[in-house]
């Protein structure tokens, strides 16, 4: 399943918020290419002191988001430990998705 990286849409939301992605074209469904819940960069979603751990990723993020969104025209994912579990305590996390719309 090769998806050209160029046509992927990329969305990001900080922990505690929800992200809604959609495929407005008729008959198109969401196909998730990448999903990260955690922290891999310090400068994203800045917070007081809880951003130094950049080796933090929920291992289940891609499967969770695919289960929620696969084939739908729109879906909402909450960036929270309730959804993904907590991959690293005391770290302010974010959710980053790359997706495209496939017919």
UniProtKB/Swiss-Prot annotation:
PTM statement from Swiss-Prot or TrEMBL: Not glycosylated.
pH behavior: Activity is stable between pH 4 and 7 but decreases at basic pH.
InterPro entries on file: Lectin_gal-bd_dom, Lectin_gal-bd_sf
Cystine pairs: 14-45, 23-101, 56-88, 69-75
Alphabetically ordered keywords of this record: Disulfide bond, Hemagglutinin, Lectin
Entry keyword Transcription regulation: no
An example molecular function term from Gene Ontology annotations: carbohydrate binding
Pfam families attached to this UniProt entry: SUEL_Lectin (PF02140)
Thermal effects: Activity is stable up to 60 degrees Celsius, then decreases and is lost at 100 degrees Celsius.
Domain SUEL-type lectin: 13-102
Keyword Disulfide bond applies: yes
Domain of life: Eukaryota
Subunit structure, as described in the record: Homodimer; disulfide-linked.
Record function comment: Rhamnose-binding lectin. Also binds alpha-D-melibiose, alpha-D-lactose, beta-D-lactose, methyl-alpha-D-galactopyranoside, methyl-beta-D--galactopyranoside and D-galactose but not D-arabinose, L-fucose, D-glucose, D-mannose, D-maltose, D-sucrose, N-acetyl-D-galactosamine, N-acetyl-D-glucosamine, N-acetyl-D-mannosamine-D-xylose or by glycoproteins orosomucoid, thyroglobulin, ovomucoid and porcine stomach mucin. Shows cation-independent hemagglutinating activity against rabbit and human erythrocytes.
The protein's name in its UniProt record: L-rhamnose-binding lectin ELEL-1
Top-level taxonomy: Eukaryota, Metazoa, Echinodermata, Eleutherozoa, Echinozoa
